[in-house]
């Protein structure tokens, strides 16, 4: 590990010390709480949508969330380790077979829906 990677790892540890980032993947519906500063006031704004892309680049990791706002598609890119992110909550797991869901940009209505991923418990775990 070179010096730059080591410094980035230390910075990631420092930024995630007071918050936890849940594991999520493209296709998941997430609620991202963002700190918004308006003049002297600071408030938390919730942004809910489907993760259409995730970019894993260490400290520069980011993800794109897409939602439909009053009939218009809105996409927002978030830096994963940004201090402006208050929290991330996974609302629903999506079952997709692609890493980048850019094809959802051309879809609307029912064709833009994503199937929910169902998780089953194993018999050994259920017996205990």
Swiss-Prot record:
One of its GO terms (molecular function) is structural constituent of ribosome. The keyword Magnesium does not apply. Keywords: Ribonucleoprotein, Ribosomal protein. SUPFAM superfamilies: Translation proteins SH3-like domain. One of its GO terms (biological process) is translation. It comes from Ralstonia pickettii (strain 12J). It comes from the Bacteria. This is Large ribosomal subunit protein bL19. Gene3D superfamilies: 2.30.30.790. This protein is located at the 30S-50S ribosomal subunit interface and may play a role in the structure and function of the aminoacyl-tRNA binding site. Belongs to the bacterial ribosomal protein bL19 family.
């Amino acid at each position: 590990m070179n010096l730059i990677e080591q410094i980035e790892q230390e910075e990631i540890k420092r930024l995630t010390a007071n918050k936890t980032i849940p594991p999520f993947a493209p296709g998941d519906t997430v609620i991202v709480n963002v700190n918004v500063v308006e003049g002297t006031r600071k408030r938390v704004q919730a942004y809910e949508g489907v993760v259409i892309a995730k970019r894993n680049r260490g400290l520069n990791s980011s993800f794109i969330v897409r939602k439909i706002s009053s009939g218009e598609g809105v996409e927002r890119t978030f830096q994963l380790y940004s201090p402006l992110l208050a929290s991330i909550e996974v609302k629903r797991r999506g079952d997709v077979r692609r890493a980048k869901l850019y094809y959802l940009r051309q879809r609307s209505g029912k064709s833009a829906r994503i199937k929910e991923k169902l998780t089953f418990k194993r018999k050994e775990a259920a017996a205990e």
